[in-house]
Amino acid sequence: MSGKSIFDKLWDRHVITGDEGQPQLMYVDQHYIHEVTSPQAFQGLRDAGRKVRRPDLTFGTFDHNVPTVNIFDIRDAISKAQIDKLAENVIEFGIDNASHGSDKQGIVHMVGPETGRTQPGKFIVCGDSHTATHGAFGAIAFGIGTSEVEHVFATQTLWQVKPKKMLVEFTGKPQKGIYSKDYILALIAKYGVACGVGYVVEYRGEAIDRLTMEERMTICNMSIEFGSKMGIMNPDQTTYDYMRGRECVPEDFDAAVADWKTLVSDDDAEYDKVIRMDVSELAPMVTWGTNPSMGVDFDTPFPEVRDMNDERAYHYMGLRPGQKAEDINLGYIFIGSCTNARLSDLQLAARIVKGKKISPNLTAIVVPGSRPVKRAAEKIGLDKIFKDAGFEWREPGCSMCLGMNPDKVPDGVHCASTSNRNFEDRQGFGAKTHLCSPAMAAAAAIAGHFVDVRRMPEVQ
């Protein structure tokens, strides 16, 4: 009998009933909620006269709709209603939360790891497609719909069919100026946004082992853009060092670590599909089109039109085949989102812009992903570096990642963004989004267009 992958081991731990290949009832260890996908689920509970079965395993955040300038000045009626309703619901149902304006407030996929609620071995769900972020800790984590949110509220369980397994192995050592965001964008550009459909993706390899937890979260975060709702990594000493001392980790932390060490994939584990990518061959990535697979490295011209999707993307973006990333006239820079708004992301960007000024006629904003990150950044003076360079330093939230709050890119304007999606109108009606690493976004803010960060002395 072959060995088991980490996913197999975690799945087996959480099956309550059901046969493999059929829907199985799974126990949920941690349920994260936010203001957008929870109101109808709470109302369903209320209508049925039910309670939240395990409020102690549920945690709420306020992130998608919150303004990042005056955080309580919510002018959109729907956004305000969703914020107010979550505030009411967490009180009514006895759910702990990082309340709007609190010291812990932030994006759900930031707050979970920061508080230590996200742990190896857990089965984690949230009504948000980027829940795979938490898989970087060695957890099964994925997004669910509102009806499933209600089901978890009521039962602390979820019916799921076990997916196939894919191994993505990142090998080699990257050049300077190449980051984990480039790894995942390069993977998606090469294999497409549907490659991971029906699979859980396990990321591993020497290039993963060298990454910090914050860098690993960036890769797992964009599993959904690769087509997979689940991404997972094996926990290791880097994981345990990140978690030690956080608020919600197990009291007997060493005993927990001993258990977590048994969860890693066996050497003879088998996979349904295997992909290998040598990161030493990568260059900085930038997307040119309207889905994350429409990306090229800095050295490569935009491709010829291959189908109607390309034709539509070029028309929407106002670009043409043969151009290069440096030809894009940028008007906005966004450094933030659950993909790249952690302290290390901000430190990287600050090193590049320190002592410089952003390009004239360009708007650049930095949005820390959580209030703890904002405080930590301000403690070491990052806010001053950004403001001196001409950036706007904002309050935490999802911000310009999506057009669901006041932070929007104007119609027709190109934005270098550290977020995860570049769909039509994603950052505002007519907004033209280019996904990239924090280093590429910061350097572009100074130049007014994309530049090769490998050539910058500030980049390590």
UniProtKB/Swiss-Prot annotation:
Binds 1 [4Fe-4S] cluster per subunit. One of its GO terms (molecular function) is metal ion binding. Disulfide bonds: none annotated. It catalyses: (2R,3S)-3-isopropylmalate = (2S)-2-isopropylmalate. Transmembrane segments: none annotated. PROSITE patterns: ACONITASE_1, ACONITASE_2. Keywords: 4Fe-4S, Amino-acid biosynthesis, Branched-chain amino acid biosynthesis, Iron, Iron-sulfur, Leucine biosynthesis, Lyase, Metal-binding. One of its GO terms (biological process) is L-leucine biosynthetic process. HAMAP family: LeuC_type1. Belongs to the aconitase/IPM isomerase family. LeuC type 1 subfamily. Heterodimer of LeuC and LeuD. This is 3-isopropylmalate dehydratase large subunit.
